[in-house]
Amino acid sequence: MRFKILQKDGLARTGIIETQRGIIHTPAFMPVGTNGTVKAMTPEEVRQIGYEIILSNTYHLYLRPGHETIKMIGGIHKFINWHCPILTDSGGFQIYSLASLRKITLEGVEFRSHIDGSLHFINPEKAIDIQLALGSDIMMVLDECIPYPADEEYVEKSIKLTTEWAKRCKEHFEKQDTYQALFGIIQGGVFSDLRIRALEELLKIDFHGYAIGGLSVGEPKTDMYKIVKDISPLMPEDKPHYLMGVGDLIDVLHAVEHGIDMFDCVIPTRNARNGTLFTSQGRISIKRSEFKEDLSPLDPDCDCYTCKNYSRAFLRHLYTCREILSMRLNTIHNLYFYCRFFEKMRQAIAERRFQEFKKEWLPVLEKNFYQESNDFHHSLENY
């Protein structure tokens, strides 16, 4: 994997990540394909919209159909018919979400499946082996996702554990003959000094890219923004910077401003299934009665399949009837909106007008905004 910066505007930057399966233009958004599929979409549709990379969840694929099954079939790309890059997480966040069903030690983590209660054990070496079997293009180290709130003493112990796991992941990774890349994960809760210390330790290990993990888990937005502002500029300039699990576009703008290159989140797809849609005029809830006889397109400025073919009235009808087509049409639109937003943002950085872009979009993104719980994605079934 190679990373090249094409243009900078302040700390915001646009670039390309070169992988064996294709180029990823950054800043990049990765739709979440929990079980190997972006919900309600075919891989071909996701690609046609313009996405160059998706994220798949190691935890879910490990439990079913199983990483060995996917390896036998020929790897995750063949299995799901997606021939562009894939990033797999290590499963750390999903295991963290199990709370009472897990036990963490220096050796690894023991947990019970949320599906059938069966007992499992994953250590750093196994986390790498699972991702090797899946055949993703970018792998993540096993880490402990720190809950919020957490006191400083707990966080300090946790980052020592994550650092030790990162060393073991890298040592095991280096024994393999693979084209895959491995990213380290910076933990540390809301304590900037501990985050900086964690980053310094990861830099000694040396990874292909670096991720900020453990945010968007219930902490105030101001804390999230402060961590990104304090940490991102200290990450190696010549390697990708990834903010894990963050996808609210307001948060994205603040993060890109400080040098973040990669994002993933279930927001566009989950919101689509719940009837919340992003438009050039702000968010709308399609279930509202005001759209019952509205024959205008969802977003007059959008060229997606949904907006070119269907009215707000029809989309509301589908949603209130709980038709499966509602999920599909809404998801097509939200993913299209996100993809075009990132394209426009990259263009703004390339033309050195990112601040104008941010100033233009913040009021739009805040319009009709309803506060969504930061911990909505803690439920494994929400993926």
UniProtKB/Swiss-Prot annotation:
It comes from the Bacteria. One of its GO terms (cellular component) is cytoplasm. PANTHER family: QUEUINE TRNA-RIBOSYLTRANSFERASE (PTHR46499:SF1). SUPFAM superfamilies: tRNA-guanine transglycosylase. Its cofactor is Zn(2+). The keyword rRNA processing does not apply. Its EC number is 2.4.2.29. Pathway: tRNA modification; tRNA-queuosine biosynthesis. Catalyzes the base-exchange of a guanine (G) residue with the queuine precursor 7-aminomethyl-7-deazaguanine (PreQ1) at position 34 (anticodon wobble position) in tRNAs with GU(N) anticodons (tRNA-Asp, -Asn, -His and -Tyr). Catalysis occurs through a double-displacement mechanism. The nucleophile active site attacks the C1' of nucleotide 34 to detach the guanine base from the RNA, forming a covalent enzyme-RNA intermediate. The proton acceptor active site deprotonates the incoming PreQ1, allowing a nucleophilic attack on the C1' of the ribose to form the product. Signal peptide: none annotated. This is Queuine tRNA-ribosyltransferase. Belongs to the queuine tRNA-ribosyltransferase family. One of its GO terms (molecular function) is metal ion binding. The active site is at D89, D264. Residues 245-251, 269-273 are annotated as: RNA binding. It is an enzyme of class 2 (transferase).
